[in-house]
């Protein structure tokens, strides 16, 4: 059919795909034959052979290290905003929503030379295909800590879900906040569902990144307001932490190159005491920022928008979001 009627073959591909992919996954000799006619489907419902697709994306989707990046989505509607952002950068996105596509992605990465498959929601758009060295967020360490703390304090508690908060410079017109999930960890968990011996990954919590765009006016507004509102309460805490960190570094330096039995017990005890005091001061700092964040509706609204975009806002949290949205309007 492929040779005689390409259009008909494309129309039948979605039905044939699972059988052809299964054959390619289980029989090496079948892969050698099928890779000439097997198709990839993009989010615009266009079909390409492997060779055709490689030619389509090689100019625009090759990273700075020479790797060809195949972007893909697993659900066109749920991942629409990420797909749209990729298209706006001139990228093409594959639709890999089949039953065997998780395994196919891993196999094709091994078969295709210098190629990598990356799900479109696994990182911010500027890092999906690294064209140049990453631009660090234009904030001081203290400012990043404040932003991370206020947003982390308002993240919901979800079963087997963990969030890491990070700051990035994504431009003034970029989205203020978004959630991404590591390609590696997500794929390992998906493989655990279909492959024996990988149950360890299946038991691990889902790890997500909450990315704050420090260039966006709303994030800047939160930072400025938090800085001004908490300044008086934080100053004595930060002064104490600076003093403790200095002493901590001095003790560490004094112990460098020494064996455990060569370090006086008094120094060991002091180092332990300093570390405990540092942890206590950090807890105080986070409590101050958490109390501020609890009264800032913009922070909770931004977090809920990111959760909503990823279909992670449900039940009471969704109802509260709707009520808060009406209040803010």
Spans of features found by a protein language model:
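Conserved GHKL (Bergerat-fold) ATPase module
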Residues: 1-329
């Amino acid at each position: 059919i492929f040779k005689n009627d390409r259009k008909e073959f494309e129309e039948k591909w979605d039905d044939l795909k699972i059988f052809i992919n299964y054959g390619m996954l289980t029989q090496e000799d079948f892969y050698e034959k099928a890779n000439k006619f097997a198709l990839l489907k993009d989010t615009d419902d266009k079909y390409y052979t492997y060779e055709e697709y490689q030619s389509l994306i090689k100019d625009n989707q090759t990273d700075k290290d020479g790797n060809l990046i195949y972007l893909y989505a697993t659900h066109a509607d749920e991942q629409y905003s990420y797909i749209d952002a990729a298209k706006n950068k001139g990228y093409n996105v594959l639709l890999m929503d089949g039953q065997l596509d998780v395994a196919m992605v891993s196999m094709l990465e091994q078969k295709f030379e210098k190629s990598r498959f990356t799900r479109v929601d696994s990182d911010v758009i500027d890092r999906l295909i690294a064209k140049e060295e990453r631009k660090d967020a234009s904030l001081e360490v203290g400012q990043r800590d404040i932003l991370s703390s206020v947003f982390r304090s308002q993240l919901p508690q979800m079963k087997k879900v963990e969030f890491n908060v990070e700051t990035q410079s994504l431009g003034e017109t970029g989205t203020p906040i978004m959630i991404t999930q590591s390609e590696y960890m997500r794929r390992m968990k998906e493989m655990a569902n279909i492959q024996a011996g990988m149950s360890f990954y299946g038991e691990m919590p889902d790890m997500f990144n909450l990315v704050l765009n420090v260039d966006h006016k709303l994030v800047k507004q939160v930072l400025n307001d938090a800085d001004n509102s908490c300044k008086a309460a934080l100053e004595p805490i930060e002064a104490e932490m600076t003093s403790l960190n200095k002493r901590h570094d001095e003790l560490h330096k004094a112990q460098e190159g020494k064996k455990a039995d060569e370090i006086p017990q008094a120094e060991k005890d002091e180092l332990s005491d300093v570390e405990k005091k540092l942890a206590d001061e950090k807890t105080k700092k986070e409590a101050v920022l958490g109390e501020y964040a609890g009264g800032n509706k913009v922070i909770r609204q931004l977090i809920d928008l990111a959760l909503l975009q990823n279909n992670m806002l449900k039940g009471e949290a969704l109802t509260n979001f709707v009520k808060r949205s009406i209040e803010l309007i």
